[in-house]
Amino acid sequence: MEPDSGQLTVAVQRSAHAVVVRPEGELDRDGELPLREALEKAVAATPGLLVVDCAGLTFCDSAGLDLILGAREVVETAGGALVLAEPGPALSGLLEIAGAEEVLRVYGTLAEALAAGEH
């Protein structure tokens, strides 16, 4: 049986000053568990900057955005920062409609997000 092409997978990469979480596939209420688990671990381990690299997302609904916003709140309460990189069309429209760009820092590339966190 072939895996669902929209199934969400998540890669995590750590560096000295950041944790990068890269979800790939469809982020919705039914498939958010891999990202939820990765964010929970990253939030507990982040040295200050948590970057959610959204370049691999093909879809995101309000449940996915709520998950990201909840993680941002936890990270900021602990004194860190959560930023988004490369939201692309799957997430950009949702960010705009929800007004989430008012509370989330969004960068066009992963490199820009990481560089902003070094300052």
Residues covered by each model-derived region:
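Glycine-centered tight turns that cap/initiate beta-strands
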Residues: H17, A100-V103, T109
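Short, low-complexity, intrinsically disordered N-terminal peptides in bacterial proteins
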Residues: M1-Q7, A115-H119
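A charged, well-structured terminal subsegment
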Residues: R105-H119
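Long, contiguous secondary-structure blocks with strong helical propensity
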Residues: H17-A18, A81-L82, E86, E118
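Amphipathic alpha-helical interaction surfaces in cytosolic regulatory modules
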Residues: L27-L104
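Conserved catalytic submotifs in the C-terminal HATPase_c
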Residues: S15-A16, A55, P87, A111
